[in-house]
Amino acid sequence: MKTLLLTLVVVTIVCLDLGYTRTCLISPSSTPQTCPQGQDICFLKAQCDKFCSIRGPVIEQGCVATCPQFRSNYRSLLCCTTDNCNH
């Protein structure tokens, strides 16, 4: 009986671990959302366009499979791998 109970506990833990997905803040509202499967990296990107001096940088947050390449019009780029780390 103890062996059966221990087996059920182990199977439950393994199944829960397999189903884990990342949560990241998603723009424009910065609310936490579950990322699609395979997108385990949170990112925060601040980029400038021709109106940057008036309204400030455009902020984008979300989930990605790989960190975006840094570009010259970016003010900053953050990629991280813990829940809701892209604030």
Swiss-Prot record:
Disulfide bonds join 24-42, 35-63, 48-52, 67-79, 80-85. It comes from Bungarus candidus. GO terms for molecular function: acetylcholine receptor inhibitor activity; ion channel regulator activity; toxin activity. Postsynaptic neurotoxin that binds and inhibits neuronal nicotinic acetylcholine receptors (nAChR) with high affinity (IC(50)<100 nM). Is a selective, and slowly reversible antagonist of alpha-3/CHRNA3-containing and some alpha-4/CHRNA4-containing AChRs. Homo- and heterodimer; non-covalently linked. It comes from the Eukaryota. Keywords: Acetylcholine receptor inhibiting toxin, Disulfide bond, Ion channel impairing toxin, Neurotoxin, Postsynaptic neurotoxin, Secreted, Signal, Toxin. It holds the Pfam family Toxin_cobra-type. Residues 1-21 form the signal peptide. Its main location: secreted. Expressed by the venom gland. PROSITE patterns: SNAKE_TOXIN. Belongs to the three-finger toxin family. Long-chain subfamily. Kappa-neurotoxin sub-subfamily. InterPro entries: Snake_3FTx (IPR003571), Snake_toxin-like_sf (IPR045860), Snake_toxin_con_site (IPR018354), Toxin_cobra-type (IPR054131). CDD domains: TFP_snake_toxin (cd00206). GO terms for cellular component: extracellular region. This is Kappa 1a-bungarotoxin. It is found in: Secreted.
